[in-house]
Amino acid sequence: MSDARKGPDEADDSQCDSGIESLRSLRSLPEPTAAPGSGSSQSGCPQPWRHAPETHKEPEKEDADGERADSTYASSSLTESFPLLERPEAKDPSPPAPGSPLPPAGVLSPQQLEALTYISEDGDTLLHLAVIHEAPSVLFCCLAFLPQEVLDIQNNLYQTALHLAVHLDQPDVVRALVLKGASRILQDQHGDTALHVACRRQNLACACCLLEEQPEPGRQLSHPLDLQLKNWQGLACLHIATLQRNQPLIELLLQNGADIDVQEGTSGKTALHLAVETQERSLVQFLLQAGARVDARMLNGCTPLHLAAGRGLNSISSTLCEAGADSLLLNVEDETPQDLAEDLLSYLPFDDLKISGKPLLCTD
């Protein structure tokens, strides 16, 4: 678990390569001279090694999860700030056709190159900003001109443009980034991949793009998508979807190879344990029908039936017993589910028991 708990400051250099070197290699032109005290070049475009003037700084915005989903970049319209990037074909917000060749770097003017290699004080590249400000013309211009490595640059919160596109519910942008080879396994400051974010926000459309789209021919796939990858809380995507009680999202993950019995990293709970804790019987039934192991054990030896019995969840206990749960398994404290149960009759998978001709009534 030591690896799963690493914070962003402790992450391996190989994992946290921001791609800055790619920007430096792209920007091989001599630096234009600016007037003393000026924050921009003579062309009027911001220089990539300077931050936006403080006088124009906008307050940061946060999304529903408390994550920063905006930038301190000066203008609310990137197309006004970077007019040199406007192209006739960039007016069309649809992504470039798959397999289209990348334009040679020589077609860029020095001013356009400065704009494309801009980095804000928050570590946001122009690609981050295009996602934040919903500027599709700038976004697809970046996708056409920038090398693949630049797509994976992480800002100061370790977010890639792909993270932000999911945060801001932009499935078309997510699809375009995946087609261009953006990494889907990079983790932000919480250890979340873009798919973790999609599961937490219950964004089925973005999750579909991340799971089902593949890079176009000629694009390098550096690392395959790992559905068992855990964030710093020890949660895989399936755990998050289960806690959100989102059955369509759970089904999508399972169809694409998620391990239904993967254990979270703190106490060893599986999705079935978490479903019991949500106290939603239909979710427990769904996971059992999908093949969840009914007697999966936590690190302390508890099965889902231990949890249901200890919480007095009689209907869920009955469902687990009907699926074959063993009510006599011991945990590390030598307790069985029967020891924890308030009502042993809840374990019996029958509803027509009679004593001396009188029915036994079991209530939840």
UniProtKB/Swiss-Prot annotation:
Residues with the Phosphoserine modification: S18
Location(s), subcellular: Cytoplasm
Post-translational modification: Serine phosphorylated; followed by proteasome-dependent degradation.
Pro residues bias: start-end ranges: 93-104
UniProt main location, coarse: cytoplasm
Primary role: Sequesters NF-kappa-B transcription factor complexes in the cytoplasm, thereby inhibiting their activity. Sequestered complexes include NFKB1/p50-RELA/p65 and NFKB1/p50-REL/c-Rel complexes. Limits B-cell activation in response to pathogens, and also plays an important role in B-cell development.
Protein name, as recorded: NF-kappa-B inhibitor epsilon
